[in-house]
Amino acid sequence: MTNLSGSMPSSTAADLQPALRVEGLGFYYGTKKVLEGVTMAIPVGKVTAMIGPSGCGKSTLLKAFNRIAELEGRVKVTGKIEFFGQNIYDQKVNINSLRREIGMVFQRPNPFPTSIYDNIVYGVKLCCNVSRAELDEIVERSLTRAVLWDEVKDSLKKSALGLSGGQQQRLCIARALAVNPKVLLMDEPCSALDPISTLKIEELINSLRENVTITIVTHNMQQALRVSDYTAFFNTDESRIGQLVEFDTTQNIFSSPQETQTRDYVAGRFG
């Protein structure tokens, strides 16, 4: 169990240890209900996509996983989210430690207005007492994992703001990887990128999956098919506010969904 002081979609997934387990989750911003009765589990070492129309609560769930949603205002949580067996909303949980263990990459690249090098080491310096040599190793390793090292190794002291949009997003991924998270959350990481940069991010996701559990929110159905092992479909209408409609292997969600709403959504009939 990680020290920070849902049911599975198929028999195959049930054999996998969950990195995150959600049980009966309800989530409110103030008095506004955003999620209701969500139960699911994110298996370790897999990529899980969350899809659904705008406003269905998928990004809110992503932000609930590392409690960053609390930065957006007063929230109320019912039910439970466990991270390797520990309730992340327990009063004993250190939120900063949780956010190191569960990193996040946002829709638009958000590099700090500092050098490429300082972007990578920022989180490491906050949590750890390491030497300059160790920092240098972390920078190279993180940028290499993000498939960016060869492009920036001679420009580490230059501003990160001078990078292209795709490079900035890979830098943000490298920055998250620098503190060795167990889980990486991605909220539509390619929505602001061109097709070539999107391809590089998708290739990066595939290269990271063996070492980091990844959960990605995407509106791109083809992207979900390309990069994910499991897919969760959320929907919102007059009768279902922010509810999980179906969770299964990505292959099953797109080829043989069990719910009519899922079938209509992946076929492009709404959303």
Curated annotation (Swiss-Prot):
Domain of life: Bacteria
EC number annotated for this UniProt entry: 7.3.2.1
Binding positions (ATP): 52-59
Reaction(s) catalysed (UniProt annotation): phosphate(out) + ATP + H2O = ADP + 2 phosphate(in) + H(+)
The ABC transporter domain, residue ranges: 20-266
Keyword field: ATP-binding, Cell inner membrane, Cell membrane, Membrane, Nucleotide-binding, Phosphate transport, Translocase, Transport
Localization, UniProt: Cell inner membrane
Predominant cellular place of this UniProt entry's protein: membrane
GO cellular component: plasma membrane
Protein's recorded name: Phosphate import ATP-binding protein PstB 3
Annotated gene: pstB3
